[in-house]
């Protein structure tokens, strides 16, 4: 048998040699073994055509060309007279790809890696590639500390030369760090140095960052942290000599040893700047000033380089190079910093483009730009455009990319890449409290109507005590200079008694128009006119309410429950907004201040003014803005003019999800004190606690909230990363722990006249609560959950520990 194979091989070789030396003209080309690959596709990949004279080299090139297509496992080329016979064995086609046992790596990520290697459903299977993928995946598991992991590719043949590919994972357990040793440290203790690491050999319960599970990438980051720690404290000669990672025999434990050389501390002796400064030497010199004898600090050096780049970027130098070279003098332990600057070319902006704005029109984004086309590139202007787009609240993310124009030495295109979020919402609110039970509200709002930037809203509330409807439209760019124009129509039918407030009914309707004027990047003013008609009825004889009516020249009856009163008021509305938040929703940095007010103008029945001030400040406490402290306040005050009081229905209220969580909405503050009356045998003592003042008329206390003409609310929140949520959804989910406090009081309450009752003019009756909140921009809409426990409250306050809102967005 062996002799037969040798004979056949010899005959084939001699045959090839014969036509290799003499060559022959190909009259026809035949294929054997083709199944999936078309004959035409195979012919196109071959260098030989019918009519060509071929030799041995041509045959070799043909075989190589067919193998290069990746479609064949075996290729043989034979001669049958004047016919070239090509025998192939096709690689099997991948019919399906499945995964089993992979917990640390998602299926989508595995599919992406396979596709990057050319392994996908419908393509031919290259077994050598599979072996590389197995090894690569195992190396990945090793890098995250799973040294017992294994990956096996299982190939199952199917009919018609197809296969099923299944990757079977056995991940094992992550090796835990048993000990981290630092050798060579004298200035700082090992514990002090390791306290800045992410990887730890011991993790206290309160440390949510530390991790005992070994990961190669985290170790690299920790070594860089160690290097920066020393360089920032003057150790300019610091060096990490070596790092050893040892594995225990059972592959479940890791020992890490870091060998370092600290060196001595060095002080900066000076900074020398050279190179192409593009005429900005004086400004660059200001950025490189140092204090005499200051310790060398690597972070400050890096910041100085970045500041120089930003400075040049503002003048159109898009790609400056700044390199700092420390010149170390070991004799006197000083460092002279030589900074070489090459500003490079100055660039114009050819075009500004937008990507990802499928709904928002280009004009809506372009009007927020401060960088102009055809002008010098200004990195600060580009950044301002990014900030303004973020503050619109239309986008989840905004990124910028400065791209060189091919073939041009001094032109760039600026590209803003946005990811749009749902700006329309249908909100359905639900609250539940131990005393209040269940309450509902609804509203429809579209902040980016048809991509035009218009804000259009139809909001309403329908429940046991209120029917409210509002239509509002705002054009943020009524003029090209950014003057906005907004209008509103509203109707409100309010039954106060059913809302646990002092009993009255108010049917009101009105309208207002407001113009907004931008002052600069962060400040704007508003001014407008409004009209409102109020029709009051069913007013029970309540002290604060009667006090207002008396100031209006009315003389309501304490024996008649059906007191009524109507007013028509015209108001001048004004406001100021300072907004330096980093984005429009879920901000992580910056401040916002909003002042709103109104005052009645001649022709009104009432005479009063009212002012509200809202502030919010976000302070990130880490570089990634995942941990943020939020402080919020709300202040309000109003009073009458010309001897009249501010209407009681304009009072401030507190309590609920937007002010002091844990309390029922609008129930914090003064409570109603009623004059007694007994129509139809009605006995007020059945509903209220009545008392007699010095033998005078009876007064009755209640738990009905009436609000006040002054309010102060504050909140401190600690925003944290949401557990079990990946970074992909970090911009859609927010968790926070909060402490709310607030009070409402009545500055016109005469405590001396009502000495037997609470002093509702006292602003020190502060309510407090603490709890946790979760906000989620879900596919169903914005969801807000909060649970709060009041820990400082007063008689008559009503708790509502759990509150949430749910809505739909589009």
UniProtKB/Swiss-Prot annotation:
InterPro entries linked to this entry: Bac_surfAg_D15 (IPR000184), BamA/TamA_POTRA (IPR010827), D15-like (IPR039910), OM_assembly_BamA (IPR023707), POTRA (IPR034746)
Signal peptide extent: 1-20
BP terms from Gene Ontology: Gram-negative-bacterium-type cell outer membrane assembly; protein insertion into membrane
Cellular component aspect of the GO annotation: Bam protein complex
Residue ranges of domain POTRA in the record: 24-91, 92-172, 175-263, 266-344, 347-421
Domain of life: Bacteria
Localisation per UniProt entry: Cell outer membrane
Keyword Membrane: yes
Family indicated by similarity: Belongs to the BamA family.
Function: Part of the outer membrane protein assembly complex, which is involved in assembly and insertion of beta-barrel proteins into the outer membrane. Constitutes, with BamD, the core component of the assembly machinery.
Protein name: Outer membrane protein assembly factor BamA
Native source species: Escherichia coli (strain SMS-3-5 / SECEC)
Taxonomic lineage of the native organism: Bacteria, Pseudomonadati, Pseudomonadota, Gammaproteobacteria, Enterobacterales
